[in-house]
């Protein structure tokens, strides 16, 4: 059965928990408060809404650690699905 799991596209609960813990630790180390992250999220959505239609509920913005040559640094990662591009001729 474990052989078939190699081809599964769904992450295991263990992997999901591990990823969530990483995000929490990185968030803490990045020294960004929840208020700051919320402000960043709202400003990003405000700017993007001028150009594209998005579902606010589907937006995922997190702080992660990148791994550049000189060491790790926090990175802001945004997953924002676009429904439609405004002003696009149909």
Swiss-Prot record:
It comes from the Bacteria. Signal peptide: none annotated. Gene3D superfamilies: Cell division topological specificity factor MinE. Keywords: Cell cycle, Cell division. SUPFAM superfamilies: Cell division protein MinE topological specificity domain. GO terms for biological process: cell division; regulation of division septum assembly. Belongs to the MinE family. Prevents the cell division inhibition by proteins MinC and MinD at internal division sites while permitting inhibition at polar sites. This ensures cell division at the proper site by restricting the formation of a division septum at the midpoint of the long axis of the cell. This is Cell division topological specificity factor.
């Amino acid at each position: 059965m474990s052989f078939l799991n190699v081809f599964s596209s769904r992450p295991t609960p263990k992997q999901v928990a591990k990823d969530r813990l990483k995000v929490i630790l990185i968030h803490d180390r990045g020294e960004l408060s929840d208020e700051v992250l919320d402000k960043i999220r709202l400003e990003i959505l405000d700017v993007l809404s001028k150009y594209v239609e998005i579902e606010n509920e589907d937006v995922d913005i997190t702080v992660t650690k990148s791994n550049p040559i000189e060491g790790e640094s926090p990175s802001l990662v945004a997953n924002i699905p676009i429904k439609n591009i405004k002003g696009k001729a149909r």
